[in-house]
């Protein structure tokens, strides 16, 4: 097959060129998000993950948060803090991590992740990058942070996630003064956050649809839960 050019060995295939993507024009139009797992404290604490939110148009760091791992709950906390500070961007730009996208489909799985559901309820789009090169701004920021942020935390004597998270707003301010640039268009495309605190509490919770049986029970995680036989709960029988 190789001799007849029906199959080309991987080592001899032409490398796919990754063409540059122009940055967006407006602040808040596209926010790149990523998690960077690294020895951030140089052995003074366990390896952990830094969640990074960076504006595509300006290169501004908008949110940083250390956490033990790149989980849905940590992205929930970071995203809520972000939108409460800046409002709702038009879109987030991420890789295809399982937090953002269902990668293994089955008949029992939802076709949307918890994080995807949250963004859908907030009317925020999410765009998936097909390669690390496609989200170059946040990848470059990660490399810069793995150098500059580590050195500054060493000088500050910071040795824990809690200490680092309390100090990060100061670092973000100085970082943006040095590295951020002006957008081509001065318009801010963040939309006001109109949801109440109670509505946000409901949106930023883990939600799983379950059917209420005629016996007023629901099943979740191999456990059966009994609902109180109230008039309201009787009306829920047969519903999700």
Predicted regions and their residues:
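An active-site-proximal beta-strand-loop segment
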Residues: 33-62, 72
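Active-site beta-loop-alpha junctions of metal-dependent nucleic acid enzymes
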Residues: 46, 64-91
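Mobile genetic element proteins and their domesticated derivatives, centered on retroelements
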Residues: 1, 34, 53, 59, ...
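Short, solvent-exposed loop/turn segments at secondary-structure boundaries
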Residues: 44, 65-66, 103-108
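C-terminal, beta-rich DNA-binding module of retroviral/retroelements integrases
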Residues: 172-240
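Acidic/histidine-rich, metal-coordinating catalytic segments
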Residues: 83-108, 132, 188
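Basic, flexible linker segments flanking DNA-binding modules
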Residues: 1-33, 38-39, 104, 110-113, ...
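Charged alpha-helix within mobile-element recombinases
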Residues: 108, 114-184, 189-201
